[in-house]
Amino acid sequence: MSVHENDDVLYTTEHQNQNIVLCMKWGTKYGSDYVNRLYNMVKRHTTVDFKMVCLTDRTDGIDPAVQCFPIPPLALPEGSPERGWNKLSTFEPDLYGLKGNALFLDLDVVIVDNIDSFFTHSGDFLIIHDWKRPWRITGNSSVYRFKLGAFPGLMPYFREHFDEIRQKFRNEQAYLSWYVDQEKKLSYWPDSWCKSYKYHCLQKIPLAYFKPPVKPEGAKIIVFHGEINPPDAVNGGGGKWYRYVLPSDWIKEAWH
């Protein structure tokens, strides 16, 4: 092997082993501050070398350290709804030439402890096991990890069978979990690592009126879904009448 060939092998190996934190921002629901907060939280809570990549339709205000690319088009039939399926574009066989391990994080997660293990935990594909219906295989795609380009058939199958898929699966995470399970590569994060703010942190009424939300033991990432977002957790409020929310100091300390 020549010196140049050896350099090429080393370059390829390095890129195949690099860690990429992926996020996605479209529309106006979440501003650039969510991307920047997420980047800062990852920096504070990992010792692993990583590159942050945001797939977005708006780059204004995003930290220059975050590499931005357009959200790959789903290329669905004209008139088909795309918004609910956008995350699947992270599985394009060639995502802007990116290589390595990809850890996808929703913009509204809050990191509360070291996440090195999310890069090193064994498994070809890891996702949160749905908390509400654990008897199903469906994962929650707020946090998932995979090798970029490792599922080259996922998007072609999605496009070819879209009408059938939209009837069978409620959302992208249901299709994603099913497809990876068909490949015999579906696995889940340890249960304590990713917790729901709604299900695992909020107090039940009447305790919610005088006891603040709790941080679950062993939790590394707190996932927000439903009507409550991180600003609601920091300031209090945001819940429905039957879900009273006091301010959470530990979320305030983490979300910046």
What are these regions (language model features)?
Residues Q18-I20, N101-L103, K220:
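Structural motif
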Residues G31-Y34, P77-R83, P134-V143:
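Short, charged, surface-exposed secondary-structure boundary motifs
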